[in-house]
Amino acid sequence: MKLLILIFLTNFIYAQSSKESVITVYKDGTALVKQQIVWNTVSKGESTLDYDDIPKSIHKDTPFISIENAQVLSQKFVEKVFSSDEYFLSKKGTPITVKLKNEKAVSGSLLEISSKRITIQSKYSVRSFNRDNIEYIETKDNLSNPNFSPYLSWEVKNNRAGKLKANLVYKLSNISWDAIYRLTTNGQTKGELVVEAVISNNSNKDYLDARINLVEGEINNIKTEQMNNYSKLSMSRSVAPQSASTELGDYHIYSAGGVKNFTSKENITVGIYGPLNVNYEKIYVFENFERQQKDEPLKVEYTLSNTEKDGLGIVLPAGKVDIYTSSNKGGFEFIGSDKMGQIPKGESSKIQAGYAFDIIGKRKVLNYDRQRKSEEAVIEIVISNTKSEPSPIKIVEHINGDWVIKEQSHDYIKEDASTIHFIIDVEPGKKEYITYTYRKEWK
């Protein structure tokens, strides 16, 4: 079905060009854009300036502008765009022409229009038509300057005729970034770490000749409605030089210096740090709760310490860690991934790679005695190491309430009011037995 409307355009002063932009990207899916724009020919005195090269996901309450040699009198954000449905709804009671498929056109006064039917009153009758059978609807109106996309408009007063340069600032959704770590392990203590940033432009706008900054840290935002959902993005990788973090008040900021063009539906990967030779602690963890009985492989856990002596001592953003291990053939294989929070200098983070095939933990409750005001349990834990090398083991036990430990076979460390752990080494091809009794009392 065609919609025939006669449209005449009059002159408005639209921006002739958009220059360099600076984009600050946050991890909550928003970004701040600082855009240079130019109007080449503007008359002296009061003028109306329009700019329509804006993304659909712009936060409409955020734009503000500064213009050289001009005073901004007012600003408006125009969202209304031409819609044939809205247009014809506004034409109820006025003459229209409906052309049916394989039939002559019918003219009359529009009574009703919906997604399924159109009803008109002709000279002698009222007729209702199925929209699927209509070839086109026609009105003889002349539309002056219909809007096809949202735009910003300013009333300005400038001191002289000629070119006007401006700096426009606004926020938008659907642009985000995240950190990706690639840790390649080589044995129990040493490996290589690469830190990259993946920047996603999920908006509908291309940013050309752009400088991109990445902010690490959680900012407070009033949630706004996401205006669009988009399909899968394309991927590209930049070989940009490494970027050091600088402070931005209470946050940290990284420069994605290798990015120039940031086009819609695109992911760009840029380097932040690395490759770095790092030290880590690898340990196998067996974690349990009170009367729980288990027989399962142990969790493989790596601890990264953000210190200079361990090859770091830098600001590490939160992100995903992909873990690889060196193979006997000189390559490497993927062995797991985990999420990691921000690691300030001097702090550490634990990363889980998966579960070990050759190290098994078995936990039994050998005896349990509950009285009216107390309970007591005897616990046995067996760790079997079928690997060809010694393995460090951490056994974590969670016990709630008012408890004491007695008759333990190994020394333990109390972590907090409900957690203890044992640290042991199990020789290759051996088993290690750990036993203890916990007693709880209450009034």
Residue ranges of model-derived segments:
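Sec-dependent signal peptide recognition
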Residues: 1-7
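Long, intrinsically disordered, low-complexity accessory segments associated with secretion
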Residues: 3, 14-443
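N-terminal signal peptide c-region/cleavage motif recognized by signal peptidases
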Residues: 10-12
